[in-house]
Amino acid sequence: MSLRIAARTNFSVLKECEDWLIVDKPAPLIMHPTGKSDEVTLLGVLKDAIPGVEFFFVNRLDRETSGCVLVAKSSSVARKLGKMMGRREIKKSYQAIVSGWPDWKEVCVTEPIRRKGEFEESEIWVKQAVHPEGKASETGFRLEGIFKNGGDRFAMIGCEPRTGRTHQIRVHLEYLGYPIVGDKIYSDQGRAYLDFLEKGWTAELFERMRLDRQALHAKGVIFGWKGKVIEAQSLLPNELESFCIA
């Protein structure tokens, strides 16, 4: 029996000025229309909440990732912020709950990333992987805490992506041997994702994944704007907080 996971749409505005706003995106809210359905999107709820403004996403989060999204209110501001992002002048920080207890306090992963289907057969088109001929990638990780849930070991990891590759944090954590809880593509060798496509969300899949979303949260963003340092922080969502203290 397939279960339906309703999109959470109760986003909040963390910071705002005449040029941009930073919103706190819930999961599993998708960012923008895909053309395949009339599914609720962050772009749609923004337009409903703040009519008359054209929005441009400066950074993007996967459907199942929550947290800070920087949104420009004009194309010119979007271009400027995009260039700042390319120059690494916008710093982003994440939190991830992973399976297992790492034996390190801090580690920096610089393994290049490439779409897996480009170098070997993959049933999941979008899946990425570490590969020597991939694009240069760098992520810093910091162990923030360890805990148990249902007798199993888990850890909270602080993540700082220093490049912007697709699924970068998820790929590098899988490479380290500590996949993100609830990640259907980069844990269980992707079998959960294929099962989800075939059967939808089921009670059996929830039992395997432990969460109805991947445990990755865009915690903060910091950048300079018109002579001021802008910083926004998003609290860990209730469903992830509850998992840590269960």
Residue spans for each PLM region:
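Short strand-coil-strand connectors
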Residues: 224-228
